[in-house]
Amino acid sequence: SPFPVRNTPNMHINTVRVDYRATDEQMLAWVKRIDEIIGARQFKKGIIFTVSYARARFLAHNSTYSGQMYQHTSRNIAQVVEQFKKAKPPAVLVSPSVTTGYDFPEKECEYIVVGKIPYPDSRGALIKARQREDSNHTAQLAMEVLVQEAGRGTRSATDRCQVFVVDDTWKWWWPKHSELAPSWFRDRI
C-alpha cells in the first residue's frame, strides 16, 4: 500500500481467545473490550468484523452501544451498509461479511475492530484436502481476509483508520504467520 504507515496503525489488545471453546463469560469480556473501544470513539464511525452472524448478534445483544449498531443479514447487506454510510457518528457497522467490495473512505470509517482472526470453516472436504497439501492454506486465507478487513477504512493517502484486533489468537498466530502478510501490512503492526 502506498499510504502512510502512521495513518493506519494496527494493534492487538489483550482480550480473550475467540474460538468455539470460548465460554459465555469470555465472550462477555470480549463484548466489554469492544465497548471500551466504541466508548472512547463516540465522535467517530467504525466497523466491527465478527466472522459469523451468530457472533454479530451476540455482540449487538450484549453491547452497551447496541443502539448505535447497524447489523445486516445475508439478504440486506447493501441496504444496511448504505444506512450506515449515511449515518452520523456515533455509528458502528457490525458485520461478518463486508470484508471486500466495500469502501468506507474518510469519515465513513475511522476505526475497525477485528473481533476474530478470520479463519475459514475448515470442516469441509475440499478445505481439508487443500490443508493437507499446504499446511499454511487456512492461515493464508485468514491473512488475506484480515488484510482486506484492515483496509476497508483506508482508501486514500489522507485517510486515517485505527485497527484493533481483540482476539487473543493473535498472540500465537501473528508470530507464526506474519510472513504471509504483505510487507506494507507488517509495517503497520
Tell where the protein language model's regions lie, with residue ranges.
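Conserved P-loop NTPase catalytic core
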Residues: 1-9
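Conserved helicase motor "Helicase C" RecA-like lobe of SF1/SF2 P-loop NTPases
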Residues: 46-78
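Intrinsically disordered or highly flexible coil/loop and linker segments, enriched in small
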Residues: 40-47, 55, 65, 104-107, ...
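Conserved interdomain hinge at the start of the Helicase C-terminal
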Residues: 12-51
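A short acidic (Asp/Glu
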Residues: 56-62, 102-107, 174-177
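Feature representing long, continuous alpha-helical segments
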Residues: 28-35, 57, 61, 78, ...
